[in-house]
């Protein structure tokens, strides 16, 4: 980008749970024994990052295939392998379960773990319907355990920083969100910008299942979100922008797992509109990924699972049953938004 200033020296932005005084930073070392439900690519990515968190032990893995479970355990140094999910859940040496199975069985597998008194981190999408998501969160509340929706984007330092700027009013009142990727990832930046209480007054969509498309979402007080959905494989910007009455925040590519953001606050004067092309002053911030974590390909920035696992350790150490970065109310609100978009596009309710 032309005339882009050099970023300041890299640093981490204080996570919301610590910033609010709900947790202590050192509680990342709070010991938790993790069980992994599933052995697919997302589970491999997750384990590579999670095992680097100081308090985390990957204690068990389960698959419908005994061979897959055994190979996964051998590759990742996991002590126990099971060929039945029920046996993993019944293990008394586990505190928390990561559900990395396909979306269509998230509800069944999550409820299985919750009913056994285990904390759960369920991979996104949490469920395939709003009713299922509500039932899952209600079960966690009933059991007094954590069910964390795995929208990992919210735990990246760049996103933590962006949200703090929005909440403190640095860019004024948010009036526009623009994002391109899929319905879930673009939807979560909408709920972050406008809040879990903001309900759309109108949604217009275009495109069909399996192809490109988009959505224009209108909220009260003339506020909007413009989302573009791109079919894979494709090259696309994947930049998320949040515009307010005083300025704009850009979560740089890849917007769903960013390591940088740019903040533009224009002068409080009409001079920039009068015959000039002077760009708004910019502040650029970079938050490099943990360099000690070695990840398999092909997905970008999967080291960022680390941030979500850290937050879970801190929050459970403090006795919390949800992470403030992405709590129950917002999890359900996001499901409502995504399902509404997908229903209007005539898609299968299962979230790809």
Regions found by a protein language model. Give the residues of each.
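Hydrophobic residues in well-ordered beta-strands that form the structural core
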Residues: 82, 122, 147-149, 178, ...
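Short, Asp-centered acidic motifs that coordinate Mg2+ and/or phosphate
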Residues: 60, 80, 95-96, 176, ...
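Rossmann-like dinucleotide-binding domain that binds NAD(P)(H)
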Residues: 186-243, 254-255, 332
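NAD(P)-dinucleotide binding in Rossmann-like oxidoreductases
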Residues: 223-310, 320-329
